[in-house]
């Protein structure tokens, strides 16, 4: 998917509210 401009190394993706998920320490949108 497309990168959401957020990392999830130390904290979860806040962008999960818009459909993003954590993959390889970076938040992606499927």
UniProtKB/Swiss-Prot annotation:
Keyword Amino-acid biosynthesis attributed: no
Source domain of life: Eukaryota
Post-translational events: Contains 3 disulfide bonds. This is a cyclic peptide.
Pfam families per the UniProt record, alphabetical: Cyclotide (PF03784)
SS bonds (residue pairs): 4-20, 8-22, 13-27
Entry keywords, A to Z: Disulfide bond, Knottin, Plant defense
GO biological process, one term: defense response
Family of the protein in this entry: Belongs to the cyclotide family. Bracelet subfamily.
Domain notes per entry: The presence of a 'disulfide through disulfide knot' structurally defines this protein as a knottin.
Protein name: Cyclotide cter-G
Species name: Clitoria ternatea
């Amino acid at each position: 998917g497309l990168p959401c401009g957020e990392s999830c190394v130390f904290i979860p993706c806040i962008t999960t509210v818009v459909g993003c998920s954590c993959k390889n320490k970076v938040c992606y949108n499927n």
